[in-house]
Amino acid sequence: MSPSVEETTSVTESIMFAIVSFKHMGPFEGYSMSADRAASDLLIGMFGSVSLVNLLTIIGCLWVLRVTRPPVSVMIFTWNLVLSQFFSILATMLSKGIMLRGALNLSLCRLVLFVDDVGLYSTALFFLFLILDRLSAISYGRDLWHHETRENAGVALYAVAFAWVLSIVAAVPTAATGSLDYRWLGCQIPIQYAAVDLTIKMWFLLGAPMIAVLANVVELAYSDRRDHVWSYVGRVCTFYVTCLMLFVPYYCFRVLRGVLQPASAAGTGFGIMDYVELATRTLLTMRLGILPLFIIAFFSREPTKDLDDSFDYLVERCQQSCHGHFVRRLVQALKRAMYSVELAVCYFSTSVRDVAEAVKKSSSRCYADATSAAVVVTTTTSEKATLVEHAEGMASEMCPGTTIDVSAESSSVLCTDGENTVASDATVTAL
């Protein structure tokens, strides 16, 4: 299939711009441009890698939260959010020069930009539907799994299908206008279409969702259960303020640059406009690592409590069925990792006081575990010595980084951190 006149003209103009740019620049300027492009690629690659690890962590948290038996509608929205975030991460890595450096093709570039916008629009819609679903369920006191009906799950499926179709339709203008960016060696929306791109994205990402949520919140203000909803509404406000800070600077700057510095008047080297655009683009890329945290924050009314209870249940089951010192150490390491996720979710969804309480809870968990042993009675000296040795190992696992004192004469196990001392109920009694 032969390329169209528009594609041929666009590629020709881009190649001519690149030839003229390199012809008029000196050796130092060429080295500076290469360094700037390398810095841009490094930032995109770093954020992409961190975002993939973060997304895998969110998937692990969702797998742990299945213990709480969440509603089917919540699982439908959350797993589609994971899929849309994966599309966004993959497309962003491709469209910003990481993998297109050796194969700058206009058709592939437009396809990547199209997938990126589909992931972006669908993410905004899935978050909107999840928020509206949970706000309605909490306000009516039907936010538990046994309250859900077949109609709730059916509506969630229809909403997901509608979101994907609408996202594909809204991303068509991007597929039609995308072009190669020889300045940053990637893909971009041409500067002359920046105003249209700003209008579409601000309406889908912020305008329409905030109107729908505010209309629902105004109605909930007159509900009898409004006190149960306000903490969730606070998380919603945090989410949209975060989106405002991540999305608006880049798209507004593109419009401003199109007015102050049209594409025909752009210089051959990198100027202040290019560095400001790099900063706003980096801020936009941070959405790939920040937005997945809100999947857990919107999962339920008390997501950190549900995550903590679910993981405690799984750890208890594992400790009952798993044997060996290494397995117990691995379980404790996973437990500490989940506490880190809880603190991150608390930071984006609750107040500073709740974060402090979460830190206090995680630091004192070993003391609660140390007091859960049972009274053991021994009859011989050998059994008594074996029990003391086992108590030392158990206490060192439950209270890492503390001073352990196991005394057969005093028949007690102590965990001390300088301020608190906890004695377990596991005693040694010689008959």
Swiss-Prot record:
Q: Gene3D superfamilies, from UniProt?
A: Rhodopsin 7-helix transmembrane proteins
Task: Tell where it localizes.
Answer: Membrane
Record keywords, A-Z: Glycoprotein, Membrane, Transmembrane, Transmembrane helix
- Listed GO cellular component terms? membrane
Q: Which residues are glycosylated?
A: 105
The record's InterPro entries line, in alphabetical order, gives:
GPCR_Rhodpsn_7TM
Q: Where are the transmembrane segments?
A: 42-62, 74-94, 111-131, 153-173, 202-222, 236-256, 279-299
- The region annotated as signal peptide is none
Q: Kindly give the membrane topology term recorded for this protein.
A: Multi-pass membrane protein
Q: Matching PROSITE patterns, A to Z?
A: G_PROTEIN_RECEP_F1_2 (PS50262)
Keyword Metal-binding recorded: no
Q: Which domain of life is it from?
A: Viruses
- Identification of the protein by name: Uncharacterized protein UL78
